A protein has these predicted regions:
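Short glycine-/small-residue-rich Rossmann-like dinucleotide-binding loops
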Residues: 16, 63, 87-88, 114-115, ...
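Flexible, small-/acidic-enriched active-site or ligand-binding loops
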Residues: 2, 325-373
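A glycine-rich dinucleotide-binding beta-alpha-beta segment and adjacent secondary-structure elements
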Residues: 295-346
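Active-site-adjacent "lid/gating" segments in soluble enzymes
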Residues: 2, 26, 30, 92-237, ...
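Aromatic-enriched alpha-helical interface/lid elements that frame and gate functional surfaces
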Residues: 225-297, 301
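Conserved small-residue-rich beta-alpha loop and adjacent elements
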Residues: 3-42
Length: 381
């Protein structure tokens, strides 16, 4: 895209899955030119991730070949930033580490995305989102009081504490590079990012307002006024009536204003009884019946929508929170919104290697015959 607040910024993304390409998507959505380096063996294949890989170019280059690595160094030398998601030490072995690249391009911002970080006892260990949020302390907080921890998809480690944090770090370092002329390395670890997302929880813990066990606290489903309830049709509503005025509205709609069990909202000794009664009441109507009953009542009660339902909700539809992707299904629209520099529509995720010739011709200065020779050698795709 040419529009957006990051228009004019060029970023090279070194392959990868999950948080690193999510970071690339965020920056591409906001107008940055993102060039993704893929493996030549995948050349011509449809994008494996049609949403998260939208909005960028794809060049297919063999990073394990010295000529291929040299080509990528040339691209990065003409770029503002790089996104790298390998295990610590891999980029260095490929000749694509920050020392080499910053020596050639001192203003470069080098973003590193890992689970454990570049150092520490676990730095070389494999892992996934569930492992990172487990060690960071977040997974322990999620799930019922009488059950096991429940992983929140890979939203917390990979995306909230990973790719999104790296995007913030890259933009911050790019701003510094613009004003100082000095680049730097951004070490984004999913364990660090997940810990950061727990800032308010640790604040509650420090003040004695949080028990270090799940399902018994105000924000983890322990409170009857901040929980999910099953309805008559086996669908659910989410109740978030924390503040007194919202709690009062909840009781009013449910005809519980005069029920003594609900007179003291924060009496934890009574929470179990309150929760049982709310569960009984919500089970008497369907989800959509409750949604209509609470519409406009200011009680902070919402229907729990499925992935297919959410794009069709009137609010999401009015704000174009979701868009119809080129793959034919819904996908999230770029966010946040900008008044002066609104981004354009994201381009479809390219086939692997779709832009190899154009990028290498334009940025690396190669002639078409040179590129054909590299293809014959398997160095590019």
């Amino acid at each position: 895209m040419s529009a957006g607040p990051l228009a004019g910024i060029r970023i090279v993304e070194l392959g990868g899955i999950g948080p690193a390409p999510f970071c690339g998507m965020l920056l591409a959505d906001l107008g940055a030119e993102v060039i993704r380096v893929d493996r030549p063996a995948e050349t011509g294949k449809d994008s494996p991730h049609p949403v998260i890989l939208r909005g960028r170019s794809s060049v297919a280059v063999n990073l394990k070949d010295t000529e291929g690595a040299a080509l990528v160094r040339e691209l990065i030398g003409r770029s503002d930033a790089v996104i790298e998601g390998f295990r610590p030490g891999v980029a260095e072995r490929l000749g694509l580490g920050p020392d080499v690249l910053l020596a050639a391009n001192p203003k470069l911002v080098y973003g590193r995305m890992t689970g454990w970080g570049q150092d520490g006892p676990l730095a070389q260990e494999p892992g996934h989102d569930i492992n990172y949020i487990a060690v960071a302390g977040a997974l322990h907080t999620m799930g019922p009081a009488d059950g096991d921890p429940v992983p929140p998809l890979n939203l917390v480690g990979d995306f909230g504490g990973g790719g999104m944090l790296l995007a913030l770090g890259l933009v911050s370092a790019l701003l510094h590079a613009r004003t100082s002329g000095v680049g730097q390395v951004v070490d984004a670890a999913m364990t660090d990012g997940t810990a950061l997302l727990l800032a308010m929880t640790y604040g509650f813990l420090a003040k004695g307002g949080w028990q270090d066990r799940r399902g018994v606290n105000m924000l983890d489903g322990g409170a009857p006024f901040y929980a999910v309830y099953r309805c008559a049709d086996d669908r659910h509503v989410a109740v978030g009536a924390i503040e007194p005025q919202f709690y009062a509205a909840l009781l009013r709609v449910l005809d519980l204003v005069d029920d003594e069990r609900f007179a003291r909202q924060h009496d934890r000794a009574n929470w179990a009884l309150m929760k049982d009664e709310l569960a009984r009441l919500f089970a008497t109507r369907t989800r959509d019946e409750w949604a209509r009953a609470f519409d406009g009542q200011g009680a902070c009660v919402s229907p729990v929508l499925s992935l297919n339902e959410a794009p069709e909700h009137p609010h999401n539809s009015a704000r174009s929170t979701y868009r119809r992707g080129p793959h034919g299904g819904p996908e999230p629209s770029p966010a946040p919104r900008f008044t002066t520099t609104p981004p354009g529509e994201p381009a479809p995720a390219p086939c692997v290697g779709a832009d190899t010739t154009e990028v290498l011709t334009t940025l690396a200065g190669l002639a078409p015959d040179d590129i054909d020779t590299l293809r014959e050698k398997g160095i590019v795709g």
